[in-house]
Every structure is written in C-alpha cells, then in structure tokens.
C-alpha cells in the first residue's frame, strides 16, 4: 500500500461523507 493511495482514499471518503452530510442537512432531517 502506498501512502499517497491511502491519503487519496481517505480524502475521497471524507469528501463524500461531508457532501452527503450537507445534502442530508439541507433536506430538513
């Protein structure tokens, strides 16, 4: 496992999570 691949995967997970959290918050739940 390359450290760059791990960092990129973690960045994608955090970005997807925060994006879905913003969408979930805007839908009023």
Curated annotation (Swiss-Prot):
Keywords: Chloroplast, Electron transport, Membrane, Photosynthesis, Plastid, Thylakoid, Transmembrane, Transmembrane helix, Transport. It holds the Pfam family PetN. It is found in: Plastid, Chloroplast thylakoid membrane. Its main location: plastid. GO terms for biological process: cytochrome complex assembly; photosynthesis. SUPFAM superfamilies: PetN subunit of the cytochrome b6f complex (SSF103451). One of its GO terms (molecular function) is electron transporter, transferring electrons within cytochrome b6/f complex of photosystem II activity. InterPro entries: Cytochr_b6-f_cplx_su8_sf, Cytochrome_b6-f_cplx_su8. GO terms for cellular component: chloroplast thylakoid membrane; cytochrome b6f complex. It is a single-pass membrane protein. The chain crosses the membrane at residues 3-23. Belongs to the PetN family. The 4 large subunits of the cytochrome b6-f complex are cytochrome b6, subunit IV (17 kDa polypeptide, PetD), cytochrome f and the Rieske protein, while the 4 small subunits are PetG, PetL, PetM and PetN. The complex functions as a dimer. Component of the cytochrome b6-f complex, which mediates electron transfer between photosystem II (PSII) and photosystem I (PSI), cyclic electron flow around PSI, and state transitions. This is Cytochrome b6-f complex subunit 8. It comes from Marchantia polymorpha. The gene is petN.
